[in-house]
A protein has these predicted regions:
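C-terminal motif of bacterial Sec signal peptides marking the signal peptidase cleavage site
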Residues: 20-23
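A sequence/structural signal for flexible, mid-protein segments enriched
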Residues: 25-318
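Sec-dependent signal peptide hydrophobic core
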Residues: 9-16
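N-terminal secretory signal peptides that target proteins for export/translocation
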Residues: 1-8
Length: 318
């Protein structure tokens, strides 16, 4: 079996019900603070540049007022499920793999992908996931994929379609008013949106050999306002972990750096999931309103999403 784990980016959302919502009148408190845990699915199938094999993570929601410990995290991943993937004509089983079972070298690689710092001896939860490690069913644009999950006496299903991709026409760095134009530039793009289909987009940014970073807000777009038009779109650079905030260079790209833009096309169900999740994360606070994260999964929470990615690598220059 050829393991492709180093190519995988496993994004883990702990759907712990972390919404302690307040309003001007009175705080919102759930009727039942000890609701039964619900299963959460987070899975993806990809096509295009650097496509990972189909994979998913199974977790459970946590009680509203629960305390989170290393034991809680380790016990939050669901192991032993039967997961099948189908494209309508072929069906395969996804293999289960847990972090604790990996050889030391692969643990280091997996930790990097998962965002854990091994050298600092930080706690790393025993993440278990299910994947098509042999690429027996690689994602293809235009195809629909169904998953079926059997676990804890429950049957969970979901369906997603990898869209026909719409590529960027061009990327261009331009001066930005008020900034040091010799050192930092703004990135703008041009997109010809087809009128015959509804399209949903997202972008991520990688600087040099670093990881892809998703902007904390505004990374998602649909074509409701520019369907069938030629459209110019600015792509601000998101700040990296630990990067200090500087208002004069916020969103700008340092001249001379190699930059990769990951342009993602997705179906509506994945767009709705990410859009409501992103809105919820960015609107927490004492005067925020409750946002229900949308799901396309039947029998559980979460998402099963199909996407197509195109990478554009350019050097920042005028």
């Amino acid at each position: 079996m050829m393991m492709r784990l180093p190519l995988m980016r496993v994004y883990i959302f702990l759907f712990s019900t972390l919404f302690l919502i307040s309003s001007c009148e009175e705080p919102f408190i759930p009727e039942n603070l000890q609701q039964e845990p619900q299963i959460v699915v987070e899975g993806f199938i990809e096509a295009g540049d650097g496509a990972n094999p189909a994979y998913l993570v199974l977790t459970k929601t946590l009680p509203f007022l629960s305390s989170i410990s290393s034991e809680t995290l380790n016990n939050n991943y669901i192991s032993g499920a039967k997961v099948t993937l189908s494209d309508g004509s072929k069906t395969i089983n996804l293999s289960e793999l847990c972090f604790k079972d990996l050889p030391p070298a692969l643990k280091v690689e997996a930790a990097k992908i998962l965002g854990f710092n091994v050298s600092a001896n930080n706690f790393i939860p025993n993440v278990c996931f299910y994947a098509d490690l042999n690429f027996a069913m690689p994602g293809q644009a235009g195809k629909t994929y169904q998953i079926e999950i059997l676990t804890e006496g429950k049957k969970i299903t979901a369906s997603t379609t990898i869209p026909i991709p719409v590529s960027l026409d061009s990327l261009k760095f331009i001066p930005n008013a008020g900034a040091n134009q010799d050192s930092f530039l703004l990135l703008t793009s041009k997109l010809s949106d087809p009128i015959a289909q509804q399209n949903f987009y997202r972008y991520q940014v990688k600087m040099g050999d670093g990881p892809f970073i998703t902007p904390g807000g505004g990374s998602l777009f649909d074509d409701r306002l520019f369907n069938g038009q030629n459209f110019r779109l600015n792509l601000p650079r998101p700040g990296g972990d630990g990067e200090s905030f500087n208002i004069s260079t916020f969103g700008l790209y340092p001249v001379g750096k190699e930059t990769t833009i990951r342009w993602v096309n997705m179906d509506q169900s994945l767009f709705d999931f990410w859009n409501t999740l992103e809105f919820s994360i960015n609107n927490q606070g004492p005067f925020s309103t409750y946002t229900r994260v949308k799901t396309n999964v039947k029998g559980a929470l979460g998402v099963w999403g199909g996407l197509y990615a195109k990478n554009y690598t350019i050097t920042v220059k005028k």
